[in-house]
Swiss-Prot record:
CDD domains: ATP-synt_Fo_b. Belongs to the ATPase B chain family. The chain crosses the membrane at residues 35-57. In plastids the F-type ATPase is also known as CF(1)CF(0). InterPro entries: ATP_synth_b/b'su_bac/chlpt. F-type ATPases have 2 components, F(1) - the catalytic core - and F(0) - the membrane proton channel. F(1) has five subunits: alpha(3), beta(3), gamma(1), delta(1), epsilon(1). F(0) has four main subunits: a(1), b(1), b'(1) and c(10-14). The alpha and beta chains form an alternating ring which encloses part of the gamma chain. F(1) is attached to F(0) by a central stalk formed by the gamma and epsilon chains, while a peripheral stalk is formed by the delta, b and b' chains. It holds the Pfam family ATP-synt_B. One of its GO terms (cellular component) is chloroplast thylakoid membrane. This is ATP synthase subunit b, chloroplastic. F(1)F(0) ATP synthase produces ATP from ADP in the presence of a proton or sodium gradient. F-type ATPases consist of two structural domains, F(1) containing the extramembraneous catalytic core and F(0) containing the membrane proton channel, linked together by a central stalk and a peripheral stalk. During catalysis, ATP synthesis in the catalytic domain of F(1) is coupled via a rotary mechanism of the central stalk subunits to proton translocation. Component of the F(0) channel, it forms part of the peripheral stalk, linking F(1) to F(0). It is a single-pass membrane protein.
Amino acid sequence: MYIYMNIEKIFSIALKTWPIGNSFAINTNILETNLINLGVVLAILVYFGKGILSNLLENRKQNILSTIRDAEQCYQEAAAKLKQAKLRLEQAKLKADEIRIQGLAQLEREKLELIKAADEDSKRLEESKNVTIRFEQQRAIEQVRQQVSRLALERALETLNNSLNPDLQARIIDNHIGLLRTIEGVTES
């Protein structure tokens, strides 16, 4: 900024002091053209402006280097965070696969247990059905036996009542009494 202002002052002074002519020509007179003055002014500008310009450039260089260092540090931190995030992602994927495999294994175990329980229930029901059928068969057979026995007794009584006369009844009673006496005699001895 300082240099720019100095150059501007120099040109404004030069324009005020040098008349602008209608034609263009090269003046070779060193004193008239103020080449010495211009050389001195340029030398002063270079001498004093060099320090200012080099300071400005050095400051700019330091700012740029600092910005680059900060950017590199941010990049390294971001790269480290990215690496950690990728590692966590891989761990999460492994854990998800492990959970999925465990879930499938658990599902298969439960499926087998349900099939086994259903088979056992089916066997128990089949056995219960067979027991019930056997029980009902036994009961039906027993009922048939009882009915057959009752009918046989009824027919026997009917036959006895029809064929029994008082003489036959007396002989049967005497026969049974004789049998009882024989049994008593055997048991007493």
